[in-house]
Amino acid sequence: MAFLALGINHKTASVDVRERVAFTPEQLVDALQQLCRLTASREAAILSTCNRSELYIEQDQLSAEAVLQWLADYHRLSLDELRASAYIHEEHDAVRHMMRVASGLDSLVLGEPQILGQMKSAYAVAREAGTVGPLLGRLFQATFSAAKQVRTDTAIGENPVSVAFAAVSLARQIFSDLGRSQALLIGAGETITLVARHLHEQGVRRIVVANRTLERASLLAEQFGAHAVLLADIPQELAHSDIVISSTASQLPILGKGAVESALKQRRHKPIFMVDIAVPRDIEPEVGELDDVYLYTVDDLHEVVAENLKSRQGAAQAAEELVSVGAEDFMVRLRELAAVDVLRAYRQQSERLRDEELQKAQRLLANGGNPEDVLAQLARGLTNKLLHAPSVQLKKLSAEGRLDALAMAQELFALNEGSTDKSLQ
């Protein structure tokens, strides 16, 4: 059994690379099954967010290169291009990495809580695909426990900040009074829900939620007294929007330069602040070339969240220690599991020998044998049979000069020095 964590994130890859390596929700089940089939991976899960795409894998023997090649082929990248941005963690490091990610220690915004929910979703999809078994399943459960402990026992989650909050903070810097601004939110997922909540709390004058399905947009809009529209209505809403924040799972851009240009003319070139949180991007990069548009992507939010890092660094150190302990505890339990099959086989063998000797004793008693003699013979016979195989192997190891194995046997049988049983001679 061997664990592997492999991928790219906001620290190693630009948004351009990340959007090319992203998985859509519709791709995940098939991708997982293909990954296991083509890379000799027994278990696998995929975490794909706007800031990272990671594969979590359990293999009999580690084959990171095969997995990296599969990822490059799947997304039609050259292996060299992917390798330039990829990181690979194996065994203990892979376990620790997963726990750090789930705890928000590897996030763009240190300690952000959304990543844990995204990790749980990745686990659920892998279960649906049938690519999670007992080992990776145990690792996910240990990861969730570690993240929960970090959240409970440290201040990593205090002063909650997320990419959504960072986007709203940036809007507040550009528009000093959000109470006079109108916002258009594109999408209706978790990130846009957080954006809507923060804008609502800041007293933004009007919020419009645009989504592929009106039902989903309406459910979100009702929570914050907003208006729901379809994606097709975006061009006419743009003309009234001071703030546009987008986060969908679309594979193609939703907003192009022409639509924004037209809206600016209607606004008499009153500026529009835009944040594209999506990967792949929802807003064409060329939109940023327009004079009256302030377009930011997730990569541009680094400076906004920098202040948040300062307040959480102390808590992060304590969280790192908890994660290290959690990773080590998991590896200890995993190593203990390696002995389970051996112990099971040894117990079955011992019980078979016991049953054989017990049947002999029962026959002797049925034939009128003396109970004391029968019991003594039972004990003697069982002892000899249980010691036979270890005795043969120990003599062989001794003849080969394997003193290390003899010392291990002494520890295994909990023998004190000089207390060697004559029955082993």
Curated annotation (Swiss-Prot):
Active site per UniProt: C50 (nucleophile)
Enzyme Commission no: 1.2.1.70
Binding site residues for NADP(+): G187, A188, G189, E190, T191, I192
Pfam families: GlutR_dimer, GlutR_N, Shikimate_DH
Molecular function GO terms recorded: glutamyl-tRNA reductase activity; NADP binding
GO biological process terms held by the UniProt record: protoporphyrinogen IX biosynthetic process from glutamate
Keywords: NADP, Oxidoreductase, Porphyrin biosynthesis
Site (Important for activity): H97
Remaining remarks: During catalysis, the active site Cys acts as a nucleophile attacking the alpha-carbonyl group of tRNA-bound glutamate with the formation of a thioester intermediate between enzyme and glutamate, and the concomitant release of tRNA(Glu). The thioester intermediate is finally reduced by direct hydride transfer from NADPH, to form the product GSA.
Subunit structure: Homodimer.
Name the record gives this protein: Glutamyl-tRNA reductase
Organism: Pseudomonas putida (strain W619)
